[in-house]
Amino acid sequence: VVGKPIGEGRIYRHGEAFPENQEVEDPQYIDGGIFRYHPIKDRFEVVAHGFSNPWGMDFDDNGQIFISACVIPHLWHVVPGGIYHRQGGSHVNPYVYSDIQTITNHRHRSAHGGARIYLADALPERYHNRIFMANIHEHALLTDILEPKGSGFIGHHGDDAVLANDGQWIGFSIEIGPDGAVYILDWHDPDICGIDVFEKDTGRIYRVAPPGHSGKAGINLAKLSDEELVDLQHHR
């Protein structure tokens, strides 16, 4: 059960794995899925149910939600209120006729971590609006091409942007930097799915960018005009 914290509580609270009492207002049951909280309107709601370890979520330039997942097929276009494919167990609504399946027309291996839709312009134009995902079992950074179709999308296999030759390379989180480069967190450990962390000091961050691309440094944003701030959205 999750919901808006009572009193001075926080959205995320440390405690039991399955606490019996959450002390929240308007509690809502969720067993896998996405929820959101509006800090200004003080409103809490479940967005969608389902998935399996959805470790990556991002928005395209029209505000559409896309999510990656672990073990089950790897990519979904998320519609608020939807009930989606889950790894196991029962859906929150027992009367669901059929859940919403992946938008992809292909499969990658096993688990994905992280998801970012590339809306910058430092990389070649063909990467614009592609979704970048790390695959922890393939030791790779993969891309899918998002093609609009009807009211949804199809995910086509794009470039394998990075293929590591290291069995301990575990890309897990992705960010698009202010310079337009793609940054990948590599937790670098031989145990991919276990609970033991053997190497606690070997994690690394990789930067993927065109040769010679350094971005802009030493900028005082407070001194820039609105037009100059807008121009900084371009990374070339």
Residue ranges and their predicted role:
Residues 1-231, 235:
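Beta-propeller blade termini and top-face loops
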